[in-house]
Design a protein with these regions (language model features):
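Short glycine-rich anion-binding loops that position phosphate/pyrophosphate groups of nucleotides
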Residues: 39-40, 125-126, 190-196, 237
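Short Gly/Thr/Asp-enriched flexible loops that form oxyanion-binding sites at enzyme active sites
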Residues: 194-206
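Flexible glycine/proline-rich
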Residues: 3, 81, 204-351, 359
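Short coil/turn connectors at secondary-structure junctions
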Residues: 5, 29-31, 43-46, 51, ...
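Phosphate-binding glycine-rich loops and their immediate beta-loop-alpha structural context
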Residues: 79-187, 348-367
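Phosphate-interaction motifs
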Residues: 1-108, 269, 285, 321, ...
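Short glycine-rich, flexible loops that bind phosphorylated cofactors or substrates
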Residues: 42, 96, 193-195, 343
């Protein structure tokens, strides 16, 4: 047992006659032992009187003016953690508070899942590094930086490689190097003709290509395979397509390497402000801007192009339209998965119309 307070440890039956009118004088070493918070309590004592409730007489004597009860200000053995108690379960993400509990429980080492290293290969003859003087036809590589930030946010360790030109042998060698050095490899396709053929051919020749194209939009051209028992994902070059492939395919993969499951996004019910058409062939993810009007959410679809980067920046959430559904009419209640907090959404002014820089300035001032 240990002391829960700074004070003195003593036998409670020696204090029963103490009161405001009858102060009792106790002697150190004979009646009590000075203790600090956390100190072990000798077996002959059964309570602790706080230092605030003592009157110091001299170095070896104190007065008490109220009685104490057994176990007063004492933390019994096992109050916090008992022997063989489970402190944290397996496949649990260690939080700062868990570290304290583990050490308090006498655990100084434990086995953990290794953070997966994720190799990121940007490809394309037209792709150039940020800061490069641009020529006609050049495209700045920003996808690989976005991927790196996402991988890090999800608990992985990103390893970004230099841009690889559209050449089978160059891509093959880059993939071989990345497979050797990482647990997962992401190949980000360029937009030039034949680009996907190089990626799929390399995966097929070095390992096995399981999937080339899925029925989601954006994100249709995704490729999935394995080389040397390591997952290889070919990610479309369009940024919105790339985002949803990362969210829907790569994120769960990175989490699985850590023994974790992805958490479901918060869902709110919102009324669609305008008609939203969809192809019958694909399960579609539609970015929306949310407003909170009259105690209800309203959702306005944003630009739906796969290359519309700002639609991701501006989106408060997204709705999903299943395959075989042609679209959703205005006024329909839909489920929206949130990308922004509800507090932010509820404090957003809703303006629907053509873009005006004044709106951006006002929004920045109000932010």
């Amino acid at each position: 047992n240990s002391s829960a307070m700074d004070g003195i440890a003593l036998k409670s039956d020696k204090t029963f006659q103490a009161s405001d009118r009858n102060h009792m004088v106790l002697t150190q070493g004979e009646d009590y032992l000075v203790v600090d918070t956390g100190d072990p309590i000798p077996k002959e004592f059964d309570c602790v009187v706080m230092v605030e409730d003592l009157i110091k007489v001299d170095e070896n004597h104190v007065e008490i003016y109220q009685s104490a009860v057994p176990w007063q200000n004492i933390r019994p053995l096992g109050e916090d953690i008992v022997e063989n108690q489970l402190i944290v379960p397996s496949k649990h993400k260690i939080r700062p508070v868990d570290i304290g509990a583990l050490i308090a429980g006498g655990i100084n080492e434990l086995e953990v899942y290794k953070k997966p290293t994720v190799g990121i290969i940007p490809t394309g003859t037209e792709i150039v590094e940020p800061g490069t003087e641009l020529k006609v036809g050049d495209i700045i590589d920003f996808n690989s930086r976005t991927f790196s930030a996402q991988v890090e946010e999800w608990g992985g360790i990103p390893r970004r490689y230099g841009i690889v030109k559209d050449d089978y042998n160059f891509i093959k060698q880059a993939v071989l190097n990345a497979v050797e050095e990482n647990d997962i490899v992401l190949i980000n396709a360029g937009s030039s003709a034949g680009r996907e053929d190089f990626t799929s051919s390399v995966i097929r020749d070095l390992g096995e290509l399981f999937i080339h194209g899925v029925a989601i939009k954006p994100g249709k051209p995704v490729m999935m395979g394995v080389i040397n028992n390591k997952p290889i994902i070919g990610i479309p070059g369009y940024p919105v397509s790339a985002y949803f492939v990362m969210e829907e395919i790569v994120k769960p993969l990175i989490y699985s390497f850590q023994g974790l499951e992805t958490e479901d996004k918060k869902v709110v019910r919102a009324t669609l402000t305008r008609r939203c058409m969809s192809s019958l062939k694909y399960h579609e993810f539609v970015r929306v801007k949310l407003g909170y009007i009259g105690g209800k959410y309203v959702a306005t679809p944003l630009t739906r192009g796969a290359g519309a980067t700002m639609s991701l920046v501006n989106a408060d959430g997204f709705l999903e339209i299943d395959q075989s559904i042609e679209g959703i009419e205005a006024g329909t209640a839909v489920n929206v998965k949130l990308l922004s907090s509800e507090d932010k959404i509820k404090n957003t002014l809703v303006c629907i119309g053509s873009h005006d820089p004044i709106i951006d300035i006002a929004a920045d001032i109000m932010h």
